[in-house]
């Protein structure tokens, strides 16, 4: 038994909980007053974002494109031109001897060979004509780019209207530019400064194409990055980078209305490579390399995935250079894309693959 004395029975009152009416549940509207203590939300820093110094360094690596000056006849052009003429003579003499020999054997064989030779000659002439038209179209885009830049610099309304009319002609077969062309058609009789007209045409006609071009460059860079990360041989990486870059150059040229042929594509690829060589190209700054393979990303990217990011950035550089070459107007009203626009997506893509592993 317990030594404590049991408590005597006592009566006490229970407090009833206050009943809240439905009317009192509705809060009265707060009177307007100044609020000084606001809750501050500090966003977390993204490890893939570039610092100001790194972004400036990337901008230096991506200068704007300037069309090269036309050069005269070089020794290499004279050599290949002379060799081409000699090969044409050799093929003509061989074809003539073949047709004569077939006529000597049987007339129907000779006439058949002559007909086949005529068909081949007509097809060859059509191919040459198509290539010449494509080269002329590519040259007209380059001249239009220079004329638009000159008109915007001098604020020449007549030259600007001429350049805008040429741009509308090039973009006539592109469905994405229909709305912009209609807007410019409605402003035909309006008085607009030359510089503003160039900027307006660039915004209304080329902005949808720039958006799609960025998507093409980003997707090509992602494909190169993924293939590099999973390919077993370096030769496969190089081959796929060349294939994807060539396809990207052709697709960008077709997007902006260039439609290059075989020789036009070769000339266009040479211009892109020359642009890359002049601008310091594939090289990247030390701070960007440190961000890709060192510090916070070292724990996220393996060596193979790091190579994928670098190859993807190289493809993006080629795509940006191709945009500079094939775009009818220089970047003025619209922001020119840079490596910084793609580096974050490529790094996130490869870090996600590494995390899934």
Swiss-Prot record:
Residues 27-36 have a biased composition (Basic and acidic residues). Its main location: membrane. The keyword Transmembrane helix applies. Residues 1-36 are annotated as: Disordered. It is found in: Cell inner membrane. Keywords: Cell inner membrane, Cell membrane, Membrane, Transmembrane, Transmembrane helix. It is a multi-pass membrane protein. InterPro entries: DUF697, UPF0283. It comes from the Bacteria. The chain crosses the membrane at residues 78-98, 109-129. GO terms for cellular component: plasma membrane. Belongs to the UPF0283 family. This is UPF0283 membrane protein BCAN_A1047. It comes from Brucella canis (strain ATCC 23365 / NCTC 10854 / RM-666). The lineage of its organism: Bacteria, Pseudomonadati, Pseudomonadota, Alphaproteobacteria, Hyphomicrobiales.
């Amino acid at each position: 038994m317990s030594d404590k004395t049991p408590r005597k029975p006592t009566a006490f009152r229970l407090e009833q909980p206050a009943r809240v009416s439905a009317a009192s549940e509705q809060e009265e509207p707060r009177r307007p007053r100044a609020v000084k203590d606001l809750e501050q939300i500090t966003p977390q820093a993204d490890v893939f974002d570039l610092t100001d110094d790194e972004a400036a360094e990337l901008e230096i690596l991506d200068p704007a494109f300037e069309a090269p000056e036309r050069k005269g006849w070089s020794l290499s052009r004279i050599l290949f031109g002379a060799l081409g003429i000699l090969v044409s003579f050799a093929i003509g003499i061989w074809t003539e001897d073949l047709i004569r020999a077939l006529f000597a054997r049987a007339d129907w064989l000779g006439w058949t060979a002559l007909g086949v030779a005529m068909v081949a000659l007509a097809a060859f002439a059509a191919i040459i004509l198509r290539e010449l038209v494509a080269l002329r179209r590519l040259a007209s885009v380059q001249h239009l780019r220079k004329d638009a830049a000159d008109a915007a610099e001098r604020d020449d309304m007549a030259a600007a209207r001429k350049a805008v009319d040429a741009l509308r002609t090039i973009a006539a077969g592109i469905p994405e530019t229909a709305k912009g062309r209609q807007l410019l058609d409605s402003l035909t009789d309006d008085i607009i400064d030359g510089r503003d007209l160039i900027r307006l045409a660039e915004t209304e006609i080329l902005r949808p194409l720039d958006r799609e071009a960025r998507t093409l460059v980003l997707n090509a860079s992602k494909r190169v990055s993924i293939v590099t990360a999973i390919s077993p041989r370096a030769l496969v990486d190089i081959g796929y980078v060349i294939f994807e870059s060539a396809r990207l150059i052709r697709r960008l040229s077709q997007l902006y209305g260039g439609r290059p042929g075989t020789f036009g594509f070769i000339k266009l690829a040479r211009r892109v490579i020359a642009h890359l060589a002049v601008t310091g190209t594939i090289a990247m700054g030390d701070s960007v390399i440190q961000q890709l393979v060192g510090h916070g990303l070292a724990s996220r990217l393996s060596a193979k995935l790091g190579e994928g990011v670098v190859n993807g950035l190289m493809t993006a550089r080629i795509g940006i250079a191709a945009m500079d070459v094939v775009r009818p107007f220089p970047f003025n009203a619209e922001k020119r894309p840079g490596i910084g626009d793609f580096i974050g997506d490529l790094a996130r893509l490869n870090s996600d693959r590494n995390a899934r592993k």
